[in-house]
Amino acid sequence: MARPAVARVASIMLDCNDLDGMVSFWGAILEVKEKNRFPGYVWMTRISRGGPALAFQQVSEKKATKNRLHLDLSTADPDALITHVEELGGERLHDHDIAGFHWTVCADPEGNEFCVTKSE
């Protein structure tokens, strides 16, 4: 039996209520631009060369529970990024430290959690 083709992550789709608001927030945080737009959907440019694109699907229901999947963002200056998140309407939720590895859980304006840590 032939081995199936290996898949790669082409995009990460986030459900949202405010399509334009989420495109604006995440575009500013990740410094990516809108690439394709269709009614109720937007795909952004790739997050990094060869990496996945972030995409948004407008839905009517509100976020009800903790994310089952979230983004981990790394940056040379986590405090500056977290300040930028807050300026754009996001929120710092809580900090964690395990064996010297520190990260901060944040939320976008619709409550979707993501983590911020220092680049290695």
Give, region by region, the residue ranges found by the protein language model.
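Vicinal oxygen chelate
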Residues: 2-17, 35-36, 43-57, 61-120
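Amphipathic alpha-helical segments
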Residues: 18-33, 84-87
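A generic "binding-loop/recognition-motif" signal
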Residues: 18-19, 34, 40, 77-78, ...
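Short alpha-helical
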Residues: 21, 51, 80
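Generic, ordered loop/turn and secondary-structure boundary motif
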Residues: 26, 57-60
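Short connector loops at helix/strand junctions that flank enzyme active sites
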Residues: 39, 49-51, 64-68
